[in-house]
């Protein structure tokens, strides 16, 4: 409400209120006695407000004609009453006469237009306020209750103090709280409108009676002041006499508000604790309570100590009771709390707050100290009993050592109940067994030796998957191949796929065990075959004793063949049964012998020939254990000092000795395996792209210059010079496709020929009476006349024989070629097909089959074209 300061002339004294017969005499007395004070000039009167509400309800409910009549009567009454009051009151009473408030003026202005003034304009608090401060819920409910009271029950000073009081602690409220309070205010205004509509009929009757009374009392209004003025004067007198009572009431009201705000804050904290307890475990809620205990004020602590009950429970009973209450309690939701607060009346809210306070004092405090160590021991004891009884999942598969480790960890390693719960979950899932001993963090391996390297991020080895199946025997995995087996296989098969071992054979002479007696001279063919068969003996180091017998293999063909002299000397040693004419019989074949396979010579190898691709490996002077020891010591020294030159030298020497030792154990040999080359078979070679498909078929075609294609492109909106496609980003030149999808009806430019003269009837009659096509060329080919084959030569370049044969028959107007399957033999994986083609009454059949039918038809068509002379002979 607006506050205006006025002089004491505007204040009514008891003398002025009591005697009205002689006002001019008492006016100076009042001015001298009462000092000037500050008062509230504009204050809502209860009777005026009730009248305003009645007028608004009547305006909304009555018809338009009744509204106009009532408004006219009301305006007439107001004018008459104003005139009577002005005529009856004297000049000195003008200072005492109450001025019309702004609310009354607004009500009269809106009454002319048959409308009710908005509540925002009737509220005088909005003119003086700079910031809109939200009140507490209880303040709003109390305000609503006071507005519903009868006239004169609420003092103006209390209402003014309530509006004037601003709390700075409400500045921390966020926007969501403000929105909720706006919604509540909107709902309350709707409820008020609903109440006004329900009381419409009652207020209508009251207004009619009041109008009759006004017409009767308009003559007596000039003689005596109304009761309204008396009450106004009394209230002003009380406010002037007792200015100190307002400050006391204001302070008392502020204290009550502060106390209510503390209770509301404490209630919100309890709701938050309940929400945390419902979501988290027991001890999480306990920790939260311990944190909040230190931050509360001293008054809250004393209040909580008074509220504690004398009933003492054991820690286990309290834990079970809290657990049961958490299970029964519904999860907190602020959405439902807001709806409940809107639906509850203010009286009920006040009553519930008192009962809630009393109920809270009877209940046990949530900050009650609980012996956590005792609860931890109880939980640990229960877990150990379950582990010993075997009821915990995963215990049956543990060994005795693992069980002992688990028991030790459960007895002495657990910190909280949550740790024990997590550890039991790990045991049931099989994940906790690897965490019993932290081997990856220690610097000692399983054997007790110091680790060379420490890996801080080393991954654990993946454990094998174990499936528990009843009545099943476990499959024993095959043992891995040992190093001895691998070494034996390497010694037996020393050569790999040929990448490391190259074919550089060196023949080493070997002394024969027994001197072999050479056989007599053999025929040349037999000699050649014998020498070819004896070559494996040379491979296995069984050389022929005579070196001269192998020398002719490396001489040129034109050279003279030297007869070995040893043969002549050994001829007498042959038994006499052999006829002497044997050398004469063997003399005629004097053709120089050239073996099909060159025979390696057994002559001593020169130093140039002894060059080997394998390095000469000298055996190391130390054993493997000393090499490894030297390498480990070098590694340790390098870890301490990476710039140690001696350690680097030792490392290099050990590495070189290790590689030389490994190479010495590697024995090279001849390649006896397979190169791994996958030679394709005939049917595999014939599969894939066919012969008549070219790689540049889609790129080296002719551009579109006209015809139907160009017409369609231009019809679709394409212009020469633009790119193809929707976004015009394609090729600038459209190309013709060189693929014929249909053999009939298509004519190319090469096939067009000028019109020919009609052949004579005799020639047309004898056109098809020629001899067999396969026997020789056709008459047209021989030049008998301008036949079809002679006039337009066929283009066979880059064309399939089947297509060429089809074009030939279509040009000569013959029957199309007929292909018939003549042969289909062979296994399922390697079939052999043979086709024959019939053209103009002649049949052509190739002499060999093919792996597929397309190739067989191709061979038949090619044979037909070769016989006609179109294709060159193969």
Swiss-Prot record:
Domain G-patch, first and last residues per copy: 705-751
Classification via CDD domains: DSRM_SON-like
Residue ranges of the region described as Disordered: 1-45, 68-98, 120-368
Domain DRBM: 800-870
Source species taxonomy: Eukaryota, Metazoa, Ecdysozoa, Arthropoda, Hexapoda
Compositional bias annotation for Low complexity: 70-89
PANTHER family: PROTEIN SON
Function (record text): RNA-binding protein that protects nascent transcripts containing intronic transposable sequences, known as INE-1, from being degraded by DIP1. Modulates DIP1 activity by repressing its sumoylation levels. This ensures that intronic sequences will be degradated only after splicing. In the ovaries, regulates germline stem cells (GSCs) self-renewal by repressing the expression of the GSC differentiation-promoting factor Rga.
Listed name of the protein: Protein Son
Gene: Son
Any one biological process term the GO annotation gives: regulation of mRNA splicing, via spliceosome
């Amino acid at each position: 409400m607006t506050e205006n300061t006025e002089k004491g002339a505007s204040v009514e004294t008891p003398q002025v209120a009591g005697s009205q017969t002689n006002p001019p005499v008492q006016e100076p007395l009042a001015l001298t006695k009462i000092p000037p004070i500050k008062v509230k000039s504009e204050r809502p009167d209860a009777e005026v407000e009730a009248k305003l509400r009645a007028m608004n309800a009547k305006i909304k409910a009555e018809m338009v004609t009744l509204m106009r009549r009532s408004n006219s009567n009301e305006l007439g009454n107001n004018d008459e009453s104003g005139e009577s009051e002005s005529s009856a009151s004297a000049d000195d009473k003008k200072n005492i006469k109450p001025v019309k408030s702004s609310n009354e003026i607004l009500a009269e202005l809106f009454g002319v237009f048959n409308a009710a003034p908005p509540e925002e304009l009737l509220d005088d608090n909005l003119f003086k306020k700079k910031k809109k401060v939200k009140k507490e819920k209880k303040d709003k409910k109390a305000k609503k209750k006071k507005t519903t009271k009868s006239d004169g029950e609420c003092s103006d000073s209390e209402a003014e103090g309530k509006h004037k009081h601003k709390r700075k602690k409400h500045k921390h409220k966020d926007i969501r709280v403000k929105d909720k309070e706006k919604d509540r205010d909107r709902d309350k205004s709707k409820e008020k409108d609903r109440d006004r509509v329900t009381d419409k009929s009652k207020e209508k009757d009251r207004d009619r009676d009041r109008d009759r009374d006004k017409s009767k009392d308009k003559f007596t209004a000039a003689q005596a002041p109304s009761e309204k003025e008396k009450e106004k004067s009394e209230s002003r007198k009380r406010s002037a006499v007792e200015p100190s009572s307002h400050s006391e009431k204001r302070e008392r009201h502020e204290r009550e508000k502060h106390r209510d705000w503390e209770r509301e804050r404490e209630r919100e904290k309890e709701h938050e604790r309940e929400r945390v307890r419902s979501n988290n475990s027991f001890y999480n809620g306990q920790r939260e309570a311990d944190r909040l205990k230190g931050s509360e004020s001293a008054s809250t602590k004393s209040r909580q100590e008074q509220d504690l009950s004398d009933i003492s429970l054991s820690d286990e009973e309290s834990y079970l009771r809290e657990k049961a209450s958490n299970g029964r309690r519904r999860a907190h939701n602020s959405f439902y709390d807001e709806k409940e607060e809107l639906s509850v009346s203010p009286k009920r809210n006040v009553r519930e707050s008192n009962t809630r306070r009393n109920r809270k004092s009877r209940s046990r405090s949530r900050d009650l100290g609980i012996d956590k160590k005792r609860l931890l021991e109880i939980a640990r004891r229960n877990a150990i009993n379950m582990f010993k009884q075997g009821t915990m999942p995963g215990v049956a598969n543990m060994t005795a050592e693992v069980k002992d480790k688990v028991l030790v960890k459960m007895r002495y390693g657990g910190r909280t109940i949550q740790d024990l719960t997590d550890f039991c979950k790990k045991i049931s899932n099989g994940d906790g067994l690897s965490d019993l001993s932290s081997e990856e963090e220690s610097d000692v391996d399983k054997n007790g030796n110091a680790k060379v390297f420490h890996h801080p991020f080393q991954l654990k080895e993946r454990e094998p998957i174990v499936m528990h199946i009843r009545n099943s025997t476990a499959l024993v995995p095959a043992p891995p191949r040992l190093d001895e087996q691998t070494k034996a296989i390497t010694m037996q098969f020393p050569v790999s796929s040929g990448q490391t071992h190259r074919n550089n054979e060196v023949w080493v002479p070997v002394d024969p065990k027994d001197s072999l007696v050479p056989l007599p001279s053999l025929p040349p063919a037999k000699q050649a075959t014998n020498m070819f068969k004896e070559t494996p003996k040379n491979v296995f180091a069984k050389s022929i004793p005579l070196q001269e017998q192998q020398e002719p293999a490396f001489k040129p063909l034109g050279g003279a063949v030297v007869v070995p002299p040893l043969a002549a000397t050994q001829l007498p040693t042959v038994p006499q049964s052999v006829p002497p004419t044997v050398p004469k019989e063997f003399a005629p074949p004097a053709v120089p012998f050239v073996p099909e396979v060159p025979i390696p010579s057994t002559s001593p190898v020169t130093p140039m020939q002894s060059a080997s691709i394998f390095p000469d490996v000298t055996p190391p002077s130390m054993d493997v254990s000393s090499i490894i020891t030297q390498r480990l010591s070098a590694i340790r020294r390098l870890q301490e000092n990476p710039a140690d030159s001696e350690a680097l030298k030792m490392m290099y020497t050990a590495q070189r000795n290790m590689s030389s030792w490994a190479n010495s154990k590697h024995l090279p040999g001849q390649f006896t395996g397979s190169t791994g080359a996958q030679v394709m078979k005939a049917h595999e070679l014939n599969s894939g792209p066919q012969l008549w498909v070219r790689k540049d078929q889609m790129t080296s075609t002719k551009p579109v210059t006209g015809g139907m294609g160009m017409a369609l492109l231009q019809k679709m909106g394409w212009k020469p010079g633009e790119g193809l496609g929707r976004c015009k980003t394609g090729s600038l030149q459209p190309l013709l496709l060189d693929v014929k999808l249909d053999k009939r009806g298509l004519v190319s430019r090469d096939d067009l020929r000028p019109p020919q003269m009609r052949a004579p009837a005799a020639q047309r009659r004898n056109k098809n009476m020629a001899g067999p096509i396969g026997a020789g060329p056709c008459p047209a080919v021989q030049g008998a006349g301008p036949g079809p084959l002679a006039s337009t030569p066929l283009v066979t370049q880059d064309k399939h024989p089947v297509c060429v044969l089809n074009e030939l028959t279509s040009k000569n107007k013959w029957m199309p070629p007929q292909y018939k399957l003549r042969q289909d033999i062979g296994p399922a994986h390697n079939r052999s097909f043979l086709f024959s083609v019939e053209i103009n009454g002649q049949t052509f059949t190739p002499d060999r089959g093919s792996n597929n039918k397309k190739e067989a038809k191709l061979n038949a068509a090619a044979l037909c074209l070769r016989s006609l002379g179109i294709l060159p002979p193969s």
